[in-house]
Design a protein with these regions (language model features):
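Soluble "head" domains of membrane/secretory-pathway proteins
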Residues: 1-30, 64, 68-205
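Hydrophobic membrane-insertion alpha-helices, especially the h-region
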Residues: 35-52
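Signal peptide cleavage region of secreted peptide precursors
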Residues: 54-58
Length: 205
């Protein structure tokens, strides 16, 4: 009877020892946590690379919305420019990357009147509260589009957009024959967030 009791006690103790063996050590738990953390960071970076990119503002053509050397995040995955978007594009004519605001898309008629300081798209006046000052007709704009002493009319062609800088008096944009209409294949994405300087962090509109 004593032998049977000892055998039973030994069998009961065996699972306890097995459980003790299976319990991970603090080091194993730490390594598992680190592995999960690294994997999560990898996934986040992968998503960021495919969905977003960063760009640095160069110059004053988007003042007062954007300023020189600010850092922006733009989304580019499956992106189609829309009116009002702040877009980033390659300009083959200027041989540089430019940041402007999309005013018109393919098929739109854009009229800029410097006398009334207005921009209309398909006959509708834009609310441009983001402008810092009145527009001046002081540049050598492409005269092909001039329809009166103070106004210009642009018909946006297929696969193109018409874009302007928010700082209209210091911006080379679609009014300039050196830039013209921007082909959508040259649009890199839409600027959605300003992340630097940190005290100016915020969503763009």
């Amino acid at each position: 009877t004593n032998d049977l009791s000892k055998k039973g006690a030994a069998e009961n103790a065996k699972p306890e020892r097995d459980n003790e063996k299976k319990k991970p050590s603090p080091l194993d738990e730490a390594l598992d946590w680190i592995e999960s953390f690294v994997f999560a960071i990898f996934i986040v970076l992968l998503v960021f690379i495919f969905l977003f990119r960063t760009v640095v503002v160069d110059g004053s053509s988007m003042n007062p919305t954007l300023y020189d050397q600010q850092r922006l995040i733009l989304t580019h995955f499956n992106y189609t420019p829309e009116r009002g978007d702040i877009i980033v594009a390659n300009s083959p004519q200027l041989n540089k990357t430019i940041i402007k605001r999309c005013i018109g898309v393919a098929g739109d008629t854009v009229v800029i009147d410097y006398n009334t300081n207005t921009v209309t798209v398909n006959g509708e006046k834009l609310d441009e509260s983001y402008l810092g000052e009145a527009m001046l007709d002081k540049f050598s704009f492409d005269q092909e589009y001039k329809v009166s002493e103070t106004s210009y009319e642009y018909h946006v062609p297929k696969n193109c957009i018409f874009a302007l800088g928010d700082n209209r008096n210091d911006s080379r944009d679609s009014r300039d024959e050196g830039v013209g209409f921007i082909n959508t294949k040259n649009v890199l994405g839409k600027a959605v967030l300003r992340f630097y300087p940190f005290d100016q962090f915020g969503k763009l509109s």
